[in-house]
Design a protein with these regions (language model features):
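Compositionally biased, charge-rich low-complexity tracts
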Residues: 4-5
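Short acidic amphipathic segments
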Residues: 25-37
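Helix N-cap motif at beta-to-alpha junctions
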Residues: 48-52
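A generic structural motif
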Residues: 41-46
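Short, surface-exposed ligand-recognition loops at beta-strand->loop->(often short) alpha-helix junctions
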Residues: 8-17
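Short hydrophobic/aromatic patches at helix-to-coil boundaries
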Residues: 65-69
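Short amphipathic alpha-helices in soluble, non-transmembrane regions
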Residues: 20-25, 56-64
Length: 69
């Protein structure tokens, strides 16, 4: 499987937000790995581009009640 990496900036990301965001993003098809950097307010997602697209991740983050930058 050839993977791509998406880096999404999330406004004011906090450690406690990860309990909401991680399952939301992991539920999307093709997600292989998710890392968060709270200091930089980013989610780093490795995924299979034949199953998902960065727009899917952006929509999921927004739907979960967060803002992206």
């Amino acid at each position: 499987m050839k993977t791509k990496t998406a880096i999404i900036s999330i406004v004011n990301l906090k450690v406690e937000d990860l309990t909401v965001l991680r399952p939301v993003l992991q539920a999307l098809p093709g997600v292989d790995k998710i890392d968060f950097n709270v200091e930089r307010s980013v989610a780093v997602i490795d995924f299979d581009p034949s199953q998902s697209h960065i727009d899917d991740f952006l929509r999921a983050v927004l739907k979960a009640g967060f803002q992206v930058s």
